[in-house]
Structure formats: structure tokens, C-alpha cells
A protein has these predicted regions:
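Short, solvent-exposed loop/turn segments at secondary-structure junctions
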Residues: 57-58, 78, 111-113, 142-145
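Active-site-proximal specificity loops/subdomain of glycosyltransferases
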Residues: 59-107, 116
Length: 149
């Protein structure tokens, strides 16, 4: 576009090639947030790129599972710290295998959502694709509505 005094040039804020991105979580007795997690990351990344571990055969599949990859594993009663270590080991090992197919893997708790600053005017997948990530990148965490007032 040109103007008598100015030449307008369209500038793309990010120069990037879209990366293939997966999201990974584990849930137990948290269908409320799991359905929201699948909805949010499914729209951002595509349901087929979501990986969910349900902790226990007593867990129901989410109503909106769609094309998500869901694995149900037997629940083992453990102390909180043992359970956390077991969960992190499982998810880390699985994430490592996902890197055979994906450029990036997002790992979050089921009640955690990565969002791009609206001022960036871009989607999560486009924003992450624009970054030059060598090992890892992390976001700022904020609890919203953790406790009722």
C-alpha cells in the first residue's frame, strides 16, 4: 500500500515455521478441569496432539475426549511425595518419547493453562513456534480463583 508521503509495509511480527506441539497431563478425580484442559489445548493445538493419563481404572473418560490420546493406568496408593515423584517420572519419560514426533511438548497440571499476552495478537502455537527454544521455556504462573473469598 502506498500513500503520497508514506509507504506502508505489512510487517509480520513473527518469522517462524510452525512447530508440531503436543500437550501432556495427568488427572485423578478432576473431570471439571480435565474437560476444560482438553477444550483449551484442543483448540490451540488440535485434539490429536493431546496426551492424557488418567490415574486409576475408576476414572471416567471425559465427555469431550474427542481425538485426544487417553491412557488409563492403575492407581497405586502412595504418599504425596512418592506419588509426585512417580507422576513426574512417568510424564517425563513419556514426554521424551513424544519428542520423536513433536518439536515441542507442553507439560502442565490439568488445572494449568498457558496463555499468550493478548497484546501479542497471536495464538499459543504461533507464539511458541516463533521462539528459538534450545532446551526449555517456562511461563509466569498465576493462581486464579484458587480459594473462594
Amino acid at each position: 500500500m502506498t500513500h503520497k508521503r508514506f509507504k506502508f509495509v505489512h510487517i509480520t511480527p513473527f518469522n517462524y515455521q510452525m512447530k508440531k506441539i503436543a500437550a501432556l497431563t495427568m488427572a485423578r478425580n478432576d473431570s471439571f478441569f480435565l474437560e476444560k484442559w482438553i477444550d483449551y489445548y484442543g483448540k490451540e493445538l488440535g485434539e490429536e496432539n493431546l496426551y492424557v493419563f488418567l490415574d486409576g481404572n475408576d476414572q471416567n473418560l471425559p465427555a469431550n475426549a474427542g481425538k485426544s490420546n487417553i491412557t488409563v493406568r492403575s492407581h497405586t496408593q502412595m504418599s504425596r511425595s512418592e506419588g509426585d515423584k512417580d507422576r513426574i517420572a512417568l510424564l517425563s519419560e513419556f514426554a521424551a518419547t513424544l519428542f520423536e514426533q513433536y518439536d515441542l511438548v507442553i507439560g502442565t497440571d490439568v488445572d494449568e493453562f498457558l496463555a499468550v499476552d493478548p497484546k501479542c495478537n497471536t495464538s499459543l502455537s504461533k507464539y511458541l513456534s516463533s521462539l528459538n527454544i534450545e532446551t526449555s521455556v517456562s511461563g509466569l504462573g498465576v493462581d486464579v480463583g484458587q480459594h473462594s473469598v
